[in-house]
Each structure stands twice: as structure tokens, then as C-alpha cells.
């Protein structure tokens, strides 16, 4: 069989990928001509560079647990890129509504809903999210007792899903909160993505949109059985005036796995050690004499 070779094939693939990132589904499935493509870029790119909207799923503590991107699914099961994201002028009303552009979809605004693995999360009525209506309070279509979608699914930040909100904000509003905005890009429906770290969940993201970089007080804190796993993993011997000190014998013995121990016995022993240390710390705290004030 004769092998076909095309000159500049890799370049054509890159150009098509760039075209699809910029145009998205605005061409209706039919590729723009070169003239239409240039006219489209002249019309749309200034809007995206000046009026970009950042979309995130935010916890009560202010952490962006999820930064919405083009492929992020809405409550209506359609992607973020299938919603209205380009505005000639930014709306003054708050919250900003991003209606779905899919024909006959009643979704009035993008509303992020997390997944439990690959499946939708359940409401307190025991039915899945996609079994609820898109109108009003998202009442259930399978039962009459549900007054609206309300899920106790726990996010990685420790807060339930119902305590989170889908936030749509401008670049200025985001900068005022000290959150990253990234570079101005011409691509469609970028939402809250500002870099590669935006793909991680908020509690794992060491920037201003997530947990943030740990401070010196955290990194230099003394370690015990209840220390953060990060400190245990990257534990370094402490230094005093440039002389390194070996770790304590008790810590070495505690962290050493005995040959006859299985995994459960090892972790149970460490857990009991931590409980004893907490009780001892509480006993010392309560045994301190109260401070008396002189009359």
C-alpha cells in the first residue's frame, strides 16, 4: 500500500486547533472562509480581551474550589462553551446571567454542579441532579416532596455543595479580591482558567484562588503526630547556628514500622500516640495556675 504524505500537515492541524479554540461553535458546524474568519476575529477578539468574565465555584471561606473552563458542565448538562460568554458591554446587573445557547434549553444562567466520580451528585430527595427541573429552584421531577435541589455532597474543602455559589465576576472585581486573572487570551469561553494550576481543585492549588502558598509560620512549625502530611513528608533536620541536629529518638521510634506490624496496626499505634499527646497537652494547659490581678 502506498503511503500518503502531505507537506505541512502538522501546521494545518495546529491552525485548525487554533481556529477551534477561537471560534468554538459560533460557525454553526461550517468552517468560516478566510475572509469570514478575519472579520470574526476583528469583531469578537476585542470583546474577549476587554470584557472577559471569570466563572468559579466558590466556598464560604472564599476559596475557588472549581475554576470553570470551556468543557465544564452546567446543571443543564451542557458545557460552559455552549453558554453566552461574549458581551459587547459588561452587564451592570448582579449576578451576571450566562444563558444557555442550545436550542430549547430553558437554562437561564450557567450553574456549576460537581460530579461524584463520573456521575451526578444526589439531592436530599435521593434523586440525581439531572432528574431535577431547570426552572426556579430546580425542583425534582421524580417526586413531589422535593422543594428544590439541595445536596450534602462534601467538597474537597470540607464544605457541603449547597454552601457553595457559582460566581461570575469581571477582571476588576477579581483583582480587588487579590485573585489571579492570568493573561488576556483570545480563546472562547475561558471562564476562570488562568493557568495550568487552574485544573486542580482549590484545596490543592497553591495560589490566591486556592489555599495559597503556606506561610513561614506553617513551614517552620514544630512537628508532632498531628502535623500536616506535607510537613511529615518533607521533614528536614532542624539547625541551630548552622549545626544540624538529628531528630529525636522518640520521633524516630514512633515513625518506624515494625516488621510484625501490618498497615492497620501501624496506623492505629500512631493514632493512639497522637491521642496521648493531645491529652497531655490539654492536661498541661489546664494545670497552669490562673493569673491573679492585684487590687
Curated annotation (Swiss-Prot):
**Source taxon at top rank:** Eukaryota
Amino acid composition bias (Basic and acidic residues), ranges on this chain = 266-278
Q: Where is this region: Disordered?
A: 244-295
What the entry lists under Pfam families is as follows: FAM221
InterPro entries reported in the protein's UniProt record: Fam221a/b
Check the record and name the PANTHER family matching this protein: PROTEIN FAM221A (PTHR31214:SF2), PROTEIN FAM221A-RELATED (PTHR31214)
Q: What protein family is recorded?
A: Belongs to the FAM221 family.
Q: What's the protein name?
A: Protein FAM221A
Q: Which organism is it from?
A: Xenopus laevis
Amino acid at each position: 500500500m502506498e503511503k500518503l504524505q502531505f507537506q505541512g500537515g502538522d501546521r494545518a492541524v495546529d491552525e485548525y486547533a487554533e481556529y477551534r479554540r477561537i471560534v468554538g461553535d459560533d460557525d454553526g458546524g461550517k468552517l468560516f472562509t478566510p475572509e469570514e474568519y478575519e472579520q470574526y476575529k476583528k469583531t469578537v477578539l476585542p470583546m474577549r480581551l476587554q470584557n472577559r468574565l471569570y466563572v468559579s465555584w466558590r466556598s464560604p471561606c472564599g476559596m475557588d474550589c472549581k475554576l470553570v473552563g470551556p468543557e465544564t458542565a452546567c446543571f443543564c448538562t451542557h458545557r460552559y462553551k455552549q453558554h453566552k460568554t461574549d458581551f459587547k458591554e459588561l452587564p451592570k446587573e448582579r449576578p451576571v446571567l450566562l444563558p444557555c445557547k442550545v436550542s430549547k434549553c430553558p437554562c437561564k444562567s450557567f450553574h456549576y454542579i460537581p460530579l461524584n466520580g463520573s456521575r451526578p451528585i444526589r439531592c436530599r430527595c435521593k434523586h440525581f441532579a439531572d432528574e431535577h427541573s431547570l426552572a426556579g429552584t430546580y425542583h425534582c421531577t421524580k417526586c413531589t416532596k422535593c422543594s428544590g435541589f439541595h445536596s450534602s455532597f462534601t467538597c474537597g474543602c470540607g464544605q457541603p455543595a449547597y454552601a457553595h455559589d457559582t460566581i461570575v465576576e469581571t477582571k476588576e472585581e477579581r483583582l480587588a479580591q487579590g485573585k489571579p486573572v492570568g493573561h488576556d487570551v483570545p480563546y472562547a469561553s475561558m471562564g476562570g482558567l488562568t493557568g495550568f494550576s487552574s485544573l486542580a481543585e482549590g484545596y490543592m492549588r497553591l495560589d490566591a484562588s486556592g489555599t495559597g502558598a503556606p506561610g513561614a509560620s506553617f513551614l517552620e512549625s514544630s512537628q508532632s503526630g498531628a502535623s500536616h502530611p506535607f510537613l511529615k513528608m518533607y521533614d528536614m533536620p532542624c539547625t541551630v547556628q548552622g549545626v544540624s541536629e538529628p531528630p529525636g529518638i522518640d520521633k524516630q521510634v514512633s515513625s518506624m514500622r515494625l516488621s510484625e506490624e501490618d498497615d492497620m496496626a501501624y496506623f492505629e499505634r500512631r493514632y493512639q500516640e497522637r491521642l496521648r499527646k493531645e491529652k497531655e497537652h490539654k492536661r498541661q494547659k489546664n494545670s497552669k495556675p490562673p493569673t491573679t490581678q492585684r487590687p
